Amino acid sequence: MRFPTVFTAMSDIILGFLLTHNSFEPPLAFGLLLVASAGLYLSGMVFNDVFDRKVDAQERPSRPIPSGRISTQSAAVLGGMLMLAGVGAAQTVGRQSLIVACLLVGAILGYDVILKKTFLGPVMMGICRFLNLMLGASAVAREINLWVKPQLRIAAAMGLFIMGLTWFARMEAKQSHRGHLIGGLLVINAGLGGLVWMLATYPWPREINLTMVLAAAGVVILTINRRLVQAILNPAPQNVQIAVKTMLISYVMLNAIMVFVWTTNPTYAIITAALLLPTILLSRWMAVT
């Protein structure tokens, strides 16, 4: 299980929740959605390893299941418990959260069990990320339409980014094809372009320094693309994995930027960006790809 990346999922919840609440009130609902997201995200990681155990035995034999440290049955039970905990936490928040969580379960299992090795695999992973951000926004009354902008547009752009990331990372354990990587780069930048377009044109509820925000986003985008180009020029597994790790870390920063733009509250943005600390720290001992 690539535990460090669970904090990237939590950054989705922070952004989504603030888009519909402007603060962390009510704190119980916010906390339960963090638990729901973490449970569902980690369950997806576990089931991914369960269904990928034969491939991992060849490409990643040190992982817990192929190495024999954890049995397939034990891993499946753990994945089921995490998934139930995630759905249960969402159900406690409310009906809309339960609906989004159930959609997310379907997307997770659809990816892990059926679609991962097909051309629809990256699409489904993007849908998972889209739904995770919408889960953060879902703590609203049932009569309120959840599926509206700005959360719908932001979630779509972030989902497109993750779709491209997944495409880019599909062959990370072995030599990747340049054409494959270039395709991933194009989708990644389509998602990033959607975010930049929204930053520049959306009627944000509070006054912001657009130049500063676009400059911050530009730094993140340039950092991502530098690693992408390096991996394309030399598509060795190590370079592709570094690019993927850079994108996962940058994802948190993109969410932090959107948090600041929506709330103009630097504290909320710093809290979001602070999720980088456990991500980076744990990645020294645990895999992120």
Which residue ranges define each predicted feature?
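Divalent metal-coordination and catalytic microenvironments
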Residues: M1, D52, A256
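Membrane-embedded alpha-helical segments that form the functional core of polytopic membrane enzymes
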Residues: A9-F51, A57, M83-Q91, R95-Y111, ...
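Acidic (Asp/Glu-rich) catalytic motifs at the cytosolic membrane interface
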Residues: A36-S74, L165-R178, L282, M286-A287
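Alpha-helical transmembrane segments
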Residues: L40-G44, K116, G218-I221, L275
